[in-house]
Amino acid sequence: MAAVLTLAASCSIKEDRSPCPCWLSIDFSRCNRSSVTVSAWGEEEIFSERVAVQDYQESEIYEKTVPKGFVNTSVITGEREMKRSGARLIIPMGHDADSIYAHASTVECFGEFAQDTAVLHKQFARVFMSVEIPIGHEYPYTFQACSDVCGIDIRDLSPVEGEFKIDLKLDEENICMFCLPRQRESGGNLKLLIYEGNEVIETIPLAEWINQMGYNWLKKDLEDIYVGVDYAKAEVSISIRGWDDGYSFKVEI
């Protein structure tokens, strides 16, 4: 009797099928990560769950029913410190971005079946900074990176505006590395602040200088950035990984 009731509640061939849900399939065959967070959005969130990719090794297909219409799909991996707030993934103050790889797409789910293929792309830029200090000199300055982008919208991988700030600590070789989230196309208000004690003595307009090099914040996979600070020459240099040329800028330190 239960089976009969279930059948009666579903869509039959003779019925108007427009209210029936759509089966959304997401192909994981190009997703070479151990686990991902899969989400879908219509006017509001439809579902979001953590998935072990290995559980889908045989079929390589993840399936869910969704309401008919346009559906935004999101597949993300690499979350560590960043926190979900609705459709946004936010960087906590004082931290850098997580190493996020992600896929986002708008799928037309108007029929009985729809399909998407998850292809993960690099949503962060590693910034490697090295400081040249003459032997026998003690470096009197500290650094802070700041921006007006504090996260990512998982529905379309666009930047989320908000305060981003991290104190940079040099290692024993006077090198540090931090991760930036995808910035706005212009680079926004990305800056490197140089402090002497509690006073900012120099502001390096990283966004402006990086843009002068032709860096593209809209690329699917963001490139890494190298910043060199030469204390003796009072010079800052910027280069992009894999590029032959770089830029050097004089600063008054």
Predicted regions and their residues:
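A surface/extracellular/periplasmic glyco- and lipid-processing/surface-interacting theme
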Residues: 127
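Structural motif
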Residues: 25-39, 130-138
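Bacterial Sec-dependent N-terminal signal peptides
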Residues: 4-32, 246, 250
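Eukaryotic extended interaction platforms
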Residues: 227-253
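Tryptophan-paired
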Residues: 36-84, 140-212, 251
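Conserved "repeat-terminator" motif of extracellular CCP/Sushi domains
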Residues: 117-124
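Structured interaction patches on ligand/partner-binding surfaces of diverse proteins
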Residues: 79-115, 198-233
